[in-house]
Amino acid sequence: MTTHFLYIEPNTSIEEVKLLFEAHLLSALPVCEGNTFIGVLRKEAVDEEDKETTVADYQYALERFFVPLTATWDTVIEAFASYHTDMLPVINETQQFIGYYYLGDFIQQLTKTPFIQEAGRILILEKSAHNYSFTETSKIVEGNGGKVLGIYLSNRTEDNVHITLKLA
């Protein structure tokens, strides 16, 4: 999480907002009053707008998405996908802006995990959605001299699951 306090306030000019979008290559910026989170302003909401206006003139365009300070990595990934954004504000239980997750930084951190870093082979298994076990799958791999570097469900339907394994 970036604890750099990059946010805009209601009195910030749209001209300054456009410069911030350009300088930081973000698709959205958090809007705060003091440290209190108000919402998120997307770049496309102000792309063609008059530079003489302020963020307060775009209250109608503010969206209210964020992740709590206690969010787990899977919640953060889901939020990035759900909100189609490259920036997720992080707020605490009193609605105070703490920082934000930047999608690029988050992906970079994921690439440092052994699942991505270690050399190995990817194997995708299709199993019954009602009869699969990570433990059983791992035991079969390890019982045959393999080493499981990572395992996750990459797809799920009513009848089947795809289990993606990275093997050493």
Regions from the language model: what does each represent?
Residues 1-20, 31-32, 37-42, 51-79, ...:
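Bateman/CBS regulatory modules and CBS-like beta-alpha motifs in cytosolic regions of diverse proteins
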Residues 22, 81, 111, 141-142:
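Signal for well-folded cores of large energy- and translation-related assemblies
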